[in-house]
Amino acid sequence: MIQEQTMLTVADNSGARRVMCIKVLGGSHRRYAGVGDIIKITIKEAIPRGKVKKGDVLKAVVVRTKKGVRRPDGSVVRFDGNACVLLNNNSEQPIGTRIFGPVTRELRTEKFMKIISLAPEVL
């Protein structure tokens, strides 16, 4: 469950380290985002010479949450932290060329197949 002002780690090599959610996209008064949802973020901490810099406003897709995601069989997949992958504002394709850490099967839609193929592990 990601809401406005939530700090997330970045699970790709775009150059950002920590980001903050500034808007949950999809609905006029939508409060929370879960795994697979697109959010608007601003970069709070970045590495030197990265593809993005501090203060940039981009879109991102949530790939891991502490709250977890419930499966139809009743199991819940939870993670130690909240993480996202940065997306290009126009094409909504990943900015980075590598994904770090596992991602969930819920991302396996037409939109995010690139993230699934780059991820080292799909849970």
From Swiss-Prot:
Q: Which domain of life is it from?
A: Bacteria
Annotated HAMAP family: Ribosomal_uL14 (MF_01367)
Q: Name one GO biological process term.
A: translation
* SMART domains the UniProt entry points to: Ribosomal_L14 (SM01374)
Q: Name one GO molecular function term.
A: structural constituent of ribosome
Q: Which UniProt keywords apply?
A: Ribonucleoprotein, Ribosomal protein, RNA-binding, rRNA-binding
Task performed by this protein:
Binds to 23S rRNA. Forms part of two intersubunit bridges in the 70S ribosome.
Describe the protein's quaternary organization and the partners it interacts with. Answer: Part of the 50S ribosomal subunit. Forms a cluster with proteins L3 and L19. In the 70S ribosome, L14 and L19 interact and together make contacts with the 16S rRNA in bridges B5 and B8.
Q: Which family does it belong to?
A: Belongs to the universal ribosomal protein uL14 family.
Listed under GO cellular component are: cytosolic large ribosomal subunit
What is the recorded name of this protein? Large ribosomal subunit protein uL14
One Pfam assignment:
Ribosomal_L14
